Every structure is written in structure tokens, then in C-alpha cells.
Amino acid sequence: MSEKKINLLDLDRKALRVLFTEMGEKPFRADQLMKWIYHFGVSDFEEMTNINKVLRAKLAAKCEIVAPEISSYQKSVDGTIKFAINVGDGQEVETVYIPEDDRATLCVSSQVGCALECTFCSTAQQGFNRNLTVAEIVGQIWRVADFIGFVKDTGERPITNVVMMGMGEPLLNLKNVIPAMDIMLDDFGFSLSKRRVTLSTSGVVPALDKLGDALDVALAVSIHAPNDELRDVLVPVNKKYPLEEFLGGIRRYIAKSNANRGRVTVEYVMLDHINDSTDQAHELAKLMKDTPCKVNLIPFNPYPGSPYGRSSNSRIDRFSKVLMEYGLTVIVRKTRGDDIDAACGQLAGDIRDRTKRLAKKQMQESQISVTMN
């Protein structure tokens, strides 16, 4: 049996330099290779003309550049495109491209399914299957960039922002998320500004501390409730890491990071008559008083079988005004791609039926406890 080839999309620049050194080559070859892959979308070693033929042959014998394939896509009336990405074994994840006048954002998945069981999220209903590899994470960007169109010979890319807000909890896959985000930030990788790469988390506090030691990227935090009693229901990981512990981790991250410009984004999904009263707005404002933040109010995006409804515009408006009375910056998120189930909280769709659900004990122990070791 032939030796399995190394997928170069799994390696950040540090790991690539080690690989080239082990091959008896100069480490700077890693920089050249990354530029071909991430700036120009090249996967054929023969097209890498500033790398000599002997080395190209060595690379072809030992390595490969393989990104997961796009299985299908849907385009919204607002220009949003939802991609189903085949990650093997009959499993898919979803990736969403959101074009705007001055930027283009890609919402990237970090896991097949999710272990956290947030009750308002479609992805959570399919359960957790496995973590994505580095290649499967950066491969989402690589495939969509190729689909939209690399501008050959210039290195210009059609994606300006990446948000780790797709399927899965990124902090439960730190082993692969950190090198993947390194590639996003690397000048020889996707060359994105640290303020244009955002990780969203529901609050796995020990992993948040590890992230702060490893990377400086923008942080969005899924709060969704102004107290532990309600958050225990909406975001069950709160039972393990309650709000005060989560807020402590957020403040520690802010102290280490400058990508956030001194504050984080608080995500708060608006659920009709569940978490959207004016009393709850006052409670949320008081909760966040010692945590520098802006608040992103997200109108709930219903999905089949959802137990919740979307807050009315009037309730969202009243909630927003209360927060602003406390001096908080408040943004009401514009829903994008909801006609193709690509909006916040809707990712999973038809994939749910093709992804097996693991037992609750395995989800909790292997994902929340073991991953932190």
C-alpha cells in the first residue's frame, strides 16, 4: 500500500517550513508554495513556475493539495449563496457567502453538527458528528474563492471577511481552528486583517483562554439571555460555564487582544416573548456594564420544527432603545439568505438527515472535557 500523501492545506506556514526542512529544502519554499495556493488558487505543482522541477516532482510524490468539494449551492434573491461542502463519508457542512457593496463575508463551519444543543439553532438539532480538519476549514474558503473567481496573476481574492459562525462550536475544535485561522491571517495565506476574521463562541471558557494565548482575532460571544436561569435553557453549555465565568473569560480575552479594539460583539437572538421584554433589556444592560461591547440583536430565523418565533419589529425596537439608554452601541442585524435557510441559526437544512447523531454522553465527554486536555 502506498504511503498516504500529506495534504498541504492541513499545514500552516510554520508546519510547512518544518516539512521543507525535513525534505532537505530551504524553509522559504513554504512562503512560495503558500502564495501559489492561497493567492492564486493553484493546486497543480506543475503550475508553480518559481519552484524548480526537481522540487515540484518531490512535492507531487509526497504531497497533495485537496480541498473538500462543493456538492451544491443555492443563491438567495439578496445575492447570498449557501454552499453544501462534501467533507467525505456522506457528510456535508454548509458555508455561506454574503456579498455587500464594500466587502464580501464568508461564514465558515468548524464541525459537522454541534455538541452544544442550543435550543434555537437548527444545527444543534442534528447533533454532533466530528471536528473538521484544517484542510476542511480553509478548504471552504479556497473552494468558494475559486467558485466566485480568483483574479489570476494579481492575487486578488473575492473574500474580504471570514466569520467562524457556521456549523459547530469553534472552541471545541481548537486543535484545527487555530492553524486554520493562522492561514487566514498569514500574509502568504489568505492575508486577511485580524479585524476581518471573527470567531463566535457560546462560551467554552477554558478554550477561550487558550485562544487568547494563541491568536488575536475579533471575538463575538453568543449571550442570548440576560440571566443564568434562561440561558441554561437556551444555551445549555451555560450549566458548565455560567454567565459570570463566561464574562470573566471575555474580559481576559479583551485584555490580550487588539483585534477587537477594546470590545467584543455580543450576539443576542430575539425570541418572541422569551428573551425580548424591556425588563430583560434592562437586565442585559446591567449584566454587560463591566464588559466593553457592542450588542448585535439578531431577529430569530425560524426553521421547521422550531419551538420559537421571531420577535416583532416593535419588540426589537423597544429592546434596542433600552440598551442604548445605558450607552450601549446596538445593531439590529439585517437578515440575509433566509429564503434559502442560510441565515443565522438556520444552517443544517437537508444535511441533518444525512448526519448521524451521537449519544449525549459522548458529546459532552469527548467534546467538552477531552478536547480541553
Curated annotation (Swiss-Prot):
The active site is at residues 94, 344. InterPro entries: Aldolase_TIM, Methyltransferase_A, RlmN_N, RNA_MTrfase_RlmN, rRNA_lsu_MTrfase_RlmN/Cfr, rSAM. CDD domains: Radical_SAM. GO terms for cellular component: cytoplasm. The keyword Iron applies. Pfam families: Radical_SAM, RlmN_N. Its cofactor is [4Fe-4S] cluster. S-adenosyl-L-methionine binds at residues 168-169, 200, 222-224, 301. The keyword rRNA-binding does not apply. One of its GO terms (biological process) is tRNA methylation. Belongs to the radical SAM superfamily. RlmN family. Reaction proceeds by a ping-pong mechanism involving intermediate methylation of a conserved cysteine residue. NCBIfam families: PRK11194.1, rRNA_mod_RlmN. This is Dual-specificity RNA methyltransferase RlmN. It comes from Shewanella halifaxensis (strain HAW-EB4). The gene is rlmN.
